[in-house]
């Protein structure tokens, strides 16, 4: 997929979003999310975040989770000061669409929203899909996103790296 005007989330059903207010100017949150290797400082389940290409819509990096999983992020849209869209997944595997957006509240605060359109369950008929989505996928993905957004808040507000598993462990991404 290219970085054109195509909607990379087209075809995905039932996205999961988390939004959190952060007591910092939008530019400070942008500086955190747009910094190369930012996940090492801000992500409570990230062990390493090596950068392949940065910055802009052709950015690529890897997320090495505490659990041993490794995902590749391929950025598709880069909106200076506002956010970006990307695809994430195992190398040469299926990808999920992810959108990061910062919205100013006033000069001293903003919100950070992360929306994931997960690739998991997309090929299962809707009549069946809603059961694992409602009981397992959505709650675990929401917990994960809450921890990630809290991690960025921690880093921006405190000026220090977020501790690993700072907001609790996660069955997919924490160390085993």
Where are these regions (language model features)?
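Beta-strand elements of well-folded, non-transmembrane domains
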Residues: 22-24, 67-69, 118-122
């Amino acid at each position: 997929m290219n970085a054109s005007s195509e909607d990379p989330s087209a075809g995905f059903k039932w996205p999961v979003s988390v939004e959190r207010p952060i007591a910092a100017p939008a530019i400070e949150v942008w500086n955190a999310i747009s910094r190369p290797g930012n996940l090492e400082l801000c992500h409570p389940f990230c062990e390493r975040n090596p950068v392949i290409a940065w910055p802009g819509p052709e950015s690529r990096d890897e997320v090495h989770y505490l659990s041993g999983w490794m995902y590749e992020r391929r950025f598709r849209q880069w909106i200076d000061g506002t956010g970006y869209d990307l695809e994430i997944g195992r190398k040469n595997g299926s990808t999920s669409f992810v959108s990061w957006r910062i919205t100013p509240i006033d000069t001293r605060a903003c919100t950070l929203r992360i929306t994931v359109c997960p690739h998991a369950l997309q090929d299962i008929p809707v009549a069946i899909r809603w059961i694992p989505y409602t009981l397992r996928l959505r709650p675990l993905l929401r917990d994960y996103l809450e921890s990630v957004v809290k991690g960025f808040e921690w880093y921006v507000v405190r000026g220090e790296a977020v501790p690993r598993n700072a907001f609790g462990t996660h069955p997919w991404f924490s160390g085993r």
